């Protein structure tokens, strides 16, 4: 009887050496995001982080998210260097809504066969997103799982923890009739609505490389999600922010009511901004109703801020100085009976 051929983990489809090569490749990206509160180095069983000493009654705020089917487009068009920014943005933009400063971030990268070059590009993007938001990339998990993913497919998830002073939590309880609403421009569809985006591409049979306002359509669609953390932390410190809404899945209709008391509504001036070209293209080529657009996409508005009307001019000046495109988009009003909490005029 012949002796069976010895098997290794690599024979089963898991390449430990590839995983080690990835860790080596991303060390510089991780180091760039390090905060003084981080203890120890990459590779420990658990990652350690102190709470900044400036907080008297610190409250930890956590969030987790993914990139959705935007990943499908990124994989199909081999654009891997910005989906990591998307991943971080989706988490940290949720934290800043409650006034929280992001402290640290962890990622989960899963694939059937680890491609070190692709994974390095993705994680370097995560590092860039963390750098943009002042957040430490403190650890993560790379899962190589043969038989679970087809071909070059991979999936991403992110987890973030931030901190806010207990007395400074922004929860919408201070919102009042007469408050102004300021919009911060998005960079594109961000990371929401991509199943509909892909359906529009399929039904319209459009060429993703076609020109749209001077650059290929696919570049508009894969533009990374804008991170608002640093500019909004400065606004929070300088003004009296009553509420913020991150316009993600569910669009205007679902995200704005999350931060409003039941007796109030947001009145949006629909003519106060022009939709970026990519949204008009999607609406036209998908024959999408306006209501559905506002329910699915941010339509050019990535973040809304509610604050007293007499603070608007100073807030707009500060945001402009921070490089944000911001404008007065509406106001808070009393809600009568069963009125919708969001009204777009």
Curated annotation (Swiss-Prot):
This protein's UniProt keywords: ATP-binding, Cytoplasm, Ligase, Nucleotide-binding, Purine biosynthesis
GO biological process, one term: adenine biosynthetic process
Record has Cytoplasm as a keyword: yes
Molecular-function GO terms, alphabetical: ATP binding; phosphoribosylamine-glycine ligase activity; phosphoribosylformylglycinamidine cyclo-ligase activity
One of the record's GO cellular component terms: cytosol
Catalyzed reactions: 2-formamido-N(1)-(5-O-phospho-beta-D-ribosyl)acetamidine + ATP = 5-amino-1-(5-phospho-beta-D-ribosyl)imidazole + ADP + phosphate + H(+)
Database matches in InterPro entries: PurM-like_C_dom (IPR010918), PurM-like_C_sf (IPR036676), PurM-like_N (IPR016188), PurM-like_N_sf (IPR036921), PurM_cligase (IPR004733)
EC number: 6.3.3.1
Record's keyword annotation contains Cytoplasm: yes
Pathway noted in the entry: Purine metabolism; IMP biosynthesis via de novo pathway; 5-amino-1-(5-phospho-D-ribosyl)imidazole from N(2)-formyl-N(1)-(5-phospho-D-ribosyl)glycinamide: step 2/2
Highest taxon, organism lineage: Bacteria
Subcellular localization, as worded in the UniProt entry: Cytoplasm
Family named by the database record: Belongs to the AIR synthase family.
This protein's name: Phosphoribosylformylglycinamidine cyclo-ligase
